[in-house]
Amino acid sequence: MARTKQTARKSTGGKAPRKQIAAKAARKAAPSTGGVKKPHRYKPGTVALREIRRYQKSTELLIRKLPFQRLVREIAQDFKSDLRFQSSAIGALQESVEAYLVSLFEDTNLCAIHAKRVTIQSKDIQLARRLRGERS
């Protein structure tokens, strides 16, 4: 096969070859940050999923006892003053309130998912209560 002569062609604006040696030297010459490491951050949603699993496993009450007791006494004042409560009565109220709220939030989440959302909104709570027959 006969050799052909190579002719010079006009450049079409391609990438210029990088100067790797100059870049390495510039990195070494630049002052370092002093070894300060950034704090570790989880991806968005990872911690939320971990909390969901943790609270679904647990059985302890999630509302603090004393603030709940104050709220019960404040609401009871509207009906009759000087009411007294056994501690077991307030405990039973708190158990039932938390069970109700958990089931309401489960239904609310289903309403949000039905609307093709992952964030619950007040209209989801209203719809869940309406479907349960709690609010007309």
Curated annotation (Swiss-Prot):
<feature type="modified residue" description="N6,N6-dimethyllysine; alternate">
    <location>
        <position position="28"/>
    </location>
</feature>
<dbReference type="InterPro" id="IPR009072">
    <property type="entry name" value="Histone-fold"/>
</dbReference>
<feature type="modified residue" description="N6,N6,N6-trimethyllysine; alternate">
    <location>
        <position position="37"/>
    </location>
</feature>
<dbReference type="GO" id="GO:0005634">
    <property type="term" value="C:nucleus"/>
</dbReference>
<feature type="modified residue" description="N6,N6-dimethyllysine; alternate">
    <location>
        <position position="5"/>
    </location>
</feature>
<dbReference type="GO" id="GO:0000786">
    <property type="term" value="C:nucleosome"/>
</dbReference>
<feature type="modified residue" description="N6,N6,N6-trimethyllysine; alternate">
    <location>
        <position position="80"/>
    </location>
</feature>
<feature type="modified residue" description="N6-acetyllysine; alternate">
    <location>
        <position position="24"/>
    </location>
</feature>
<comment type="subunit">
    <text>The nucleosome is a histone octamer containing two molecules each of H2A, H2B, H3 and H4 assembled in one H3-H4 heterotetramer and two H2A-H2B heterodimers. The octamer wraps approximately 147 bp of DNA.</text>
</comment>
<feature type="modified residue" description="N6-acetyllysine; alternate">
    <location>
        <position position="15"/>
    </location>
</feature>
<keyword id="KW-0158">Chromosome</keyword>
<feature type="modified residue" description="N6-acetyllysine; alternate">
    <location>
        <position position="37"/>
    </location>
</feature>
<keyword id="KW-0007">Acetylation</keyword>
<feature type="region of interest" description="Disordered">
    <location>
        <begin position="1"/>
        <end position="42"/>
    </location>
</feature>
<feature type="modified residue" description="N6-acetyllysine">
    <location>
        <position position="57"/>
    </location>
</feature>
<feature type="modified residue" description="N6-methyllysine; alternate">
    <location>
        <position position="5"/>
    </location>
</feature>
<feature type="modified residue" description="N6,N6-dimethyllysine; alternate">
    <location>
        <position position="15"/>
    </location>
</feature>
<dbReference type="GO" id="GO:0030527">
    <property type="term" value="F:structural constituent of chromatin"/>
</dbReference>
<feature type="modified residue" description="N6,N6-dimethyllysine; alternate">
    <location>
        <position position="80"/>
    </location>
</feature>
<dbReference type="Pfam" id="PF00125">
    <property type="entry name" value="Histone"/>
</dbReference>
<feature type="modified residue" description="Phosphoserine">
    <location>
        <position position="11"/>
    </location>
</feature>
<feature type="modified residue" description="N6-methyllysine; alternate">
    <location>
        <position position="37"/>
    </location>
</feature>
<comment type="similarity">
    <text>Belongs to the histone H3 family.</text>
</comment>
<feature type="modified residue" description="N6-methyllysine; alternate">
    <location>
        <position position="28"/>
    </location>
</feature>
<feature type="modified residue" description="N6-methyllysine; alternate">
    <location>
        <position position="24"/>
    </location>
</feature>
<feature type="modified residue" description="N6,N6,N6-trimethyllysine; alternate">
    <location>
        <position position="5"/>
    </location>
</feature>
<feature type="modified residue" description="N6-methyllysine; alternate">
    <location>
        <position position="10"/>
    </location>
</feature>
<dbReference type="InterPro" id="IPR000164">
    <property type="entry name" value="Histone_H3/CENP-A"/>
</dbReference>
<feature type="modified residue" description="N6-acetyllysine">
    <location>
        <position position="65"/>
    </location>
</feature>
<feature type="modified residue" description="N6,N6-dimethyllysine; alternate">
    <location>
        <position position="37"/>
    </location>
</feature>
<feature type="modified residue" description="N6-methyllysine; alternate">
    <location>
        <position position="19"/>
    </location>
</feature>
<dbReference type="GO" id="GO:0003677">
    <property type="term" value="F:DNA binding"/>
</dbReference>
<feature type="modified residue" description="N6,N6,N6-trimethyllysine; alternate">
    <location>
        <position position="28"/>
    </location>
</feature>
<keyword id="KW-0544">Nucleosome core</keyword>
<dbReference type="InterPro" id="IPR007125">
    <property type="entry name" value="Histone_H2A/H2B/H3"/>
</dbReference>
<keyword id="KW-0488">Methylation</keyword>
<feature type="modified residue" description="N6-acetyllysine; alternate">
    <location>
        <position position="10"/>
    </location>
</feature>
<feature type="modified residue" description="N6-methyllysine; alternate">
    <location>
        <position position="80"/>
    </location>
</feature>
<dbReference type="GO" id="GO:0046982">
    <property type="term" value="F:protein heterodimerization activity"/>
</dbReference>
<keyword id="KW-0238">DNA-binding</keyword>
<feature type="modified residue" description="N6-acetyllysine; alternate">
    <location>
        <position position="19"/>
    </location>
</feature>
<keyword id="KW-0597">Phosphoprotein</keyword>
